[in-house]
Amino acid sequence: MRIGIALYSFSGFAESALRGIAAYARPNRPWTFDHGNQTLSGVNRLLSRNPDGILISVSDPEVCERLQAAHVPIVNMHYADALPRAGRVSNDDAAIGVLAAKHFLSRGHKRFAYYAETGEPIDGRLRGFREELARSRHSCEVFHGGPYNDLAEYEARYEQPLQRWLQGLPKPIGVFCAHDHFAWRVAESCQGADISVPAEVSIVGVDNDTAICALADPPLSSVQTGSLRIGYEAAKLLDQMMTGEPLSGANILVPPVRVITRRSSDAMAAADTLVATALTHMRTHLHDTKGICLLYTSPSPRD
């Protein structure tokens, strides 16, 4: 069988999802894969190869219209429900938001913010974040600024507003970002505005894109999504659809795995930065009595 695949090539999600697809397909299924992109021309190319099924992550209306007219079994891995007659396997975005909120709350945060793309359809992440915060009687600020994949537009229209927004936020604060790309932008903006991360602004992204997380300064904490399982479940669902099972419109939500903690959020929140440093040290060395004693006897930098 010939399977068309169209995912963002340079993303942590795509890499893991592809490994999940391979894990399902390779043991005993004679599948041949054609890899393209999610543009209209890319999808037309995939369709020209007469695929038996398509695995894709797409929300563009024109591309979705073309796919709907193709009468080929399709599983969409995009968070937007843009292909109603296709199968869908995607992140449980509300659960991602809940996990991020719990991460900040566990570090003593009482102020929170959310940053996503302008017109971002991932409202589930914000909804889960808000609902979990509301259980502790907290709310959050929201900033929508710039497209996911257009750096030029972001720099021209949103870079300065983002920096001003961060400067105006009450601190310390936990900022949850819809993607790791946005978390990197927040880290850069904080650096440009002389805002300390994580003492003043603590940052958590989504996808655990290891390259982006490592390149940011400081390295980014991120919600590790179930993208490996998404790829596996998407391939399994497509297999069932291709064998005639009536599963069009099936919707499978995959929960996140955990928050991978790196330096961008690895601190306890406190209004006084010296206190925050002390709390973070004590949490890190909870079972190290020598470390606590050394902290207690160390002179204050204010002396």
Please report, for each region that a protein language model flagged, where it lies by residue:
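Conserved small/polar residues in nucleotide/adenosyl-binding loops
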Residues: 296-303
